[in-house]
């Protein structure tokens, strides 16, 4: 449990020491990829609490979800349709659902 917390802290420190600015055009893509990644993280946390965690499934889901979300936004951008709203809504709902299940787990424990 300490390794993920340590990794997050190291990531925050690296992000503060080496600020990288991205063009505004990538904002939609980055936001949806971040939501997809957070969905995978909270899903992995939920699976760990339910003792169903499988590392290859987590890692592949992490990257595949992010790539598919970015691909969906890219296709929508090319078609002139704001599909990032759909992806944001879907991943946001899944994040809140996973958080609710995690919360219930700790409250019942």
Please describe what each predicted stretch is:
Residues 86-109:
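Canonical alpha-helical transmembrane segment with a positive-inside/aromatic-interface signature
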Residues 1-6, 29-30, 54-64:
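Cytoplasmic-side transmembrane-helix entry/capping segments in multi-pass membrane proteins
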Residues 15, 32-43, 69, 73, ...:
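Alpha-helical transmembrane segments of multi-pass membrane proteins
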